[in-house]
């Protein structure tokens, strides 16, 4: 059989000045086999976060959202799916207006200490306090080379920490 579509709510990791983006921080896998999906092309849609399930010990929690599948809600293309995430080009960057530009760092530039995470848990992209607590450049899974812990009381109250849908 052939899987002809997939869907989910996720986080943009970065967008450069030309609209090229990376998202999720992990690849999209087949729900039945666990295998990484081969994606020839796809569309990135605007989504609306409508709530979240707070995470707790043994329960990861998750963001809940609506994906608007109308043609006018397409905000970009998906050109690549790999173990590190999905990559493509945004065609509509209006949702990013008002956000401050930030420099990205190579993983070898990471340092243990204060950090921040940008995420949308209540309909608005906001910055929250966090801390990088461990760095492991030799981890067998390159997606798990550092540990970040949410320290922001407001985000902890809302979500309990990092929940599904925030990866990226």
Model-derived regions, located:
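C-terminal recognition in membrane/secretory proteostasis and scaffolding
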Residues: 1-168
